[in-house]
């Protein structure tokens, strides 16, 4: 096994592990906000790691530059966290409750200020 194959294998294993952690978080976390956090953080980094391994494989082993993979990595990196944030805000706005043991609600203050300012 060459050094390139070891590096690529490490990226694939890291990506698989992070995706597994995201899947476990989606199942185990008690509310929609925790589940969104698990899905957007660890699963996104897992997908990016696997795509980076794919890019390195084609570039270093086969000598082919696959720009579409780099664009896909950039697209996932930029859009997945924003989509998770928007889904969380939407859930909050329609009244999906926080977990009863949650200790902090940062959006409550912001929405109270907006409601006072609109009157």
From Swiss-Prot:
InterPro entries, per the entry: PhaG_MnhG_YufB
- Subunit field text: Forms a heterooligomeric complex that consists of seven subunits: MrpA, MrpB, MrpC, MrpD, MrpE, MrpF and MrpG.
UniProt cross-references to PANTHER family, sorted A to Z? ANTIPORTER SUBUNIT MNHG2-RELATED (PTHR34703:SF1)
Q: What is this protein called?
A: Na(+)/H(+) antiporter subunit G
Compartment(s): Cell membrane
Among the entry's GO cellular component annotations, what is one?
plasma membrane
Pfam families in the record: PhaG_MnhG_YufB (PF03334)
Q: What else is known?
A: Mrp-dependent antiport apparently occurs by a secondary, proton motive force-dependent mechanism, but the similarity of several Mrp proteins to membrane-embedded subunits of energy-coupled NADH dehydrogenase complexes raises the possibility that there is a capacity for electron transport that could provide a primary energy coupling option for Mrp functions.
Membrane topology per record: Multi-pass membrane protein
UniProt keyword list? Antiport, Cell membrane, Hydrogen ion transport, Ion transport, Membrane, Sodium, Sodium transport, Transmembrane, Transmembrane helix, Transport
Can you tell which superkingdom this protein's organism belongs to? Bacteria
Family from the record = Belongs to the CPA3 antiporters (TC 2.A.63) subunit G family.
Q: Tell me where the transmembrane regions lie.
A: 7-29, 44-61, 66-88
| One MF annotation (Gene Ontology) recorded for this entry | sodium:proton antiporter activity
């Amino acid at each position: 096994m060459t050094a390139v194959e070891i590096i690529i294998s490490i990226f694939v294993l890291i990506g698989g592990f992070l995706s597994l952690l995201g899947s476990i978080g989606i199942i185990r976390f008690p509310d929609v906000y925790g589940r969104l956090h698990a899905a957007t953080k660890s699963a996104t980094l897992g997908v990016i790691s696997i795509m980076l391994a794919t890019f390195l494989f084609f570039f270093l082993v086969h000598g082919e530059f696959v720009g579409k993979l780099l664009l896909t990595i950039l697209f996932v990196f930029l859009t997945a966290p924003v989509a998770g944030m928007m889904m969380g805000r939407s859930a909050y706005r329609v009244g999906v409750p926080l977990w009863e043991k949650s200790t902090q609600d940062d959006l409550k203050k912001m929405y109270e200020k907006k409601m006072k300012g609109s009157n």
